[in-house]
Amino acid sequence: MKKIIFLLFFSAQFAFGNTIFWSKTGHRVIGKVAQEELSGRTRRALDRLLDGQSLASIANFADEIKADRRYREFSAWHYVNIPQDKAYSDIEPSKYGDLVTGIQKCIAMVKNGNNAKEDRVFYLKMLVHLIGDLHQPMHVGRLEDKGGNDLQLQWFGNGSNLHKVWDANMINDYGMSYTELAKSLPELDKKEIKTIQEGTILDWVHESQDIANKLYDSVEIGEKLAYSYSYTWWGTVESQLQKGGLRLAKVLNELFI
């Protein structure tokens, strides 16, 4: 019965042709989840830096500036592509930067209270987005296929690729607003939240890479994906959004102790 309800809802949303993406809706969900887990001290600090803007409202800043040539140096921060038989700790960081070094830079810049407010705000907005990217598994995909971009698939008969399926197609066709999606996530107790928040940035990178490897194993080149794929993997989408938000809150709370 659960599967039937899911498929009916999913097919109805697909028919209306919504254009919602992980890069928008997903990042806003992560911001919304994080906002609810901030300490009072962190809330006050963020209010001063962001002039009252919510995390959800600034979560897509890093994507919005991509078209501006002045910010091209930050393009490589959105992902890290790792050779299939390697872990991040086995490789040399790119000279252009990557998702991990980008997050580290953002944390350092926001943490230093001597930096100009303008700089701290810029890197704070980047940080909120990059923690979200870290939890989209294909942003920690394989070097050989550019994080799944070269792994061609079909999505409901239209051309796509594994990266796009996870970046856009599934959330696009599910059709919820970010507030609806955030509210639909499982309720967790304090112990469960604490468990999710454990670990370091590198631990979370390895976790996302492990999930990415499972996603690679779940498809074949040219495969036609549809309802059953979303039903199988939607729980992982929700889990990654929730983890991203809870861990973003942890990072921010530690920045403003």
Q: Could you tell me what each predicted segment is?
A:
Residues N18-L130, P137, R142-I257:
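N-terminal, motif-rich segments that launch catalysis or mediate targeting to/interaction with membranes
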Residues M1-K2, G17:
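Generic cytosolic/nucleocytoplasmic N-terminal low-complexity/intrinsically disordered segments
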Residues K3-Q13:
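Sec-dependent N-terminal signal peptides
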